[in-house]
Amino acid sequence: MKKLFFCLLIFASFSLNAQRLKLTNVVLVAQLDRSEDKFTAEINLAEIFAENGVNVLPSLNLLKQGASLSTLVSDSIKTILKEKQLDTYLLVNVRGYDRQFRLSSKIGSLTEELNIAHMFPLFRDEITSITFEFNFFRNDKLCHTELLKLKNVSTKEKLIQKLHKKLPRLIQRWKA
């Protein structure tokens, strides 16, 4: 009985945490190693967020090609974002290619996270599943994190298709 109560308490805290996000706008940053993967991810994710009523600005629109992601926390960029009323950063990265991954236990500040290198590409030929990690930051502090696991993704096209199918459900939860 104690275990059941404890599980319900944990579930309730996660659902309350998800409800507090109230996502209306986002600066989207795909933390991927290869530039073509970053472009593919940001364009597709921006499209999905826009279709679901979230004001989105991909980092590709703010940075010059090859620029460091840490530039996104510079004063000049923050001023531009404030003028556009964008207050939430969303860092998206590939956590891994199997179903065993958990949320990161140690997530630092926005500046620290932007400087971390992520080595996984968006897609590899031999994978069957992929896990994405979504980290939301407001005022340079982590305010929410969540994993999205996609199964049976044997091609890049299937991966994008499944992302278009599953992500809108999460976005609706994040908007609530």
Predicted regions and their residues:
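Sec/Tat signal peptide C-region and signal peptidase I cleavage site
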Residues: 14-20
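Residues that line or immediately flank small-molecule/substrate-binding pockets and catalytic motifs
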Residues: 8, 93-96, 150
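Short, hinge-like loop/turn segments at secondary-structure boundaries
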Residues: 75, 108-110
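A solvent-exposed, charged loop/short amphipathic helix patch at secondary-structure junctions
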Residues: 53, 110-119
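Sec-dependent N-terminal signal peptides
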Residues: 3-14
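C-terminal/domain-edge helix-coil "capping" segments
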Residues: 20-23, 101-102, 116-176
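Short, solvent-exposed beta-strand-terminating loops
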Residues: 95-108
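N-terminal segment of the mature soluble domain
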Residues: 23-25, 31-98
